A protein has these predicted regions:
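N-terminal Rossmann NAD(P)H-binding glycine-rich loop of SDR-like oxidoreductase domains
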Residues: 4-25
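Conserved Rossmann-fold NAD(P)-dependent oxidoreductase catalytic core, especially the SDR/UDP-sugar
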Residues: 100-150
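NAD(P)H-binding glycine-rich loop region in Rossmannoid oxidoreductase-like domains
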Residues: 38, 47, 51-97, 101
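SDR active-site strand-loop-helix element
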Residues: 8, 32, 74-78, 115-121
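Residues forming the Rossmann-fold NAD(P)(H) cofactor-binding site
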Residues: 15-16, 96, 156
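Active-site Tyr-X1-5-Lys
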Residues: 146-169
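Conserved glycine-rich Rossmann-like NAD(P)H-binding loop of the short-chain dehydrogenase/reductase
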Residues: 27-36
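Rossmann-fold NAD(P)-dependent oxidoreductase module
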Residues: 17, 21, 105, 161
């Protein structure tokens, strides 16, 4: 069965590198990029480009549409990155709402066999001064008081969406 890797944020640093490595392995790749993003020029030429907006559930649904007999694996790298607090609403809309839209689209497309979410170290709750942060291997409830900054909060909230079952039903 043919597999297509669906990569969001493909015009960003992480997404571009994910696309390049998948192509190097010989995989087929479809990239979700924001319409009009000038950084699309960095996406490898062999990648199928899909222009859309993560805040649009319809665009996310279209991104997952494939020919019968094709399975997909989604690697969700996309996020808005800023430390400017004036963009807090947009950060939540893109990073949390966009992730929720992608998860819903994946759930609506049974040919999507895996959904891989790229989070951030910022999503890890901060500990009191002097305590060491250790790898998190299980669900850690989101705590607004322990995640500092809107970008980190948005990534922590989006991560929580990915931990919330069921992804498949």
């Amino acid at each position: 069965m043919k597999t297509i890797y669906l990569v969001t944020g493909a015009a960003g640093f992480m997404g571009t590198n994910v696309c390049a490595q998948l192509l190097e392995r010989g995989d087929a790749v479809r990239a979700f990029v924001l319409k009009g993003d000038p950084a699309v020029k960095f996406v490898p030429k062999a990648v199928e480009i899909f222009e859309g907006d993560l805040c649009s559930p319809e665009d996310c649904e279209k991104f997952f549409a494939v020919e019968p007999g094709t399975q997909t694996v989604c690697i969700h790298c996309a996020s808005m990155v800023t430390i400017n607090p004036n963009y807090s609403e947009k950060l939540i809309a893109v990073n949390v709402g966009g992730t929720e839209n992608m998860l819903n689209a994946a759930k609506n497309h049974p040919e999507c066999k895996k959904f891989i979410y790229v989070s951030s170290t910022g999503a890890i709750p901060e500990l009191p001064k002097g305590e060491s942060i250790h790898e998190v291997y299980s669900f850690v409830p989101y705590d607004d008081d322990r995640v500092v900054g809107w970008y980190s909060r948005s990534k922590a909230m989006a991560t929580q969406k990915c931990w919330t079952p069921p992804l498949t039903g």
